Amino acid sequence: MARIAGVDIPRDKRVEVSLTYIYGVGPTRARTILAQTGVSPDIRVKDLEDGDLQKLRNAADDFTLEGDLRRQEGMALKRLQDIGCVRGRRHRMSLPVRGQRTRTNARTRRGARKTVAGKKK
């Protein structure tokens, strides 16, 4: 397996698809990296030459990827929570952040239902 940005990318897939295994690289960024390096998106990783792999590594280093990106996102969430803004409080309470309704729905964000005893008649 070839290693780019500290990630083993699959050898048998096309380069364009293999690059998306790196956290922070989606289809668009993968195409951008390939365009910068001049590597064909249709070639398989196992068929790449060492020079091409090195070009891909250097191009990937220009972006914030993997651990650094995860750390940045975590720090951004922590900052929102520390300043006490609405978005930070909603993150802390595990509720939807962007104004969605919560009286019904929002089950993914709120978690499994907690059964509450009904009123006796």
From Swiss-Prot:
Record-level Gene Ontology MF annotations: rRNA binding; structural constituent of ribosome; tRNA binding
PROSITE patterns in alphabetical order: RIBOSOMAL_S13_1, RIBOSOMAL_S13_2
Cellular component terms per the entry's GO annotation: cytosol; small ribosomal subunit
Listed Basic residues bias regions: 100-121
Keyword line: Ribonucleoprotein, Ribosomal protein, RNA-binding, rRNA-binding, tRNA-binding
Location of region: Disordered: 97-121
Any one of the GO BP annotations: translation
Role noted for this protein: Located at the top of the head of the 30S subunit, it contacts several helices of the 16S rRNA. In the 70S ribosome it contacts the 23S rRNA (bridge B1a) and protein L5 of the 50S subunit (bridge B1b), connecting the 2 subunits; these bridges are implicated in subunit movement. Contacts the tRNAs in the A and P-sites.
Family: Belongs to the universal ribosomal protein uS13 family.
Assembly and oligomerization: Part of the 30S ribosomal subunit. Forms a loose heterodimer with protein S19. Forms two bridges to the 50S subunit in the 70S ribosome.
Protein name: Small ribosomal subunit protein uS13
Protein encoded by which gene: rpsM
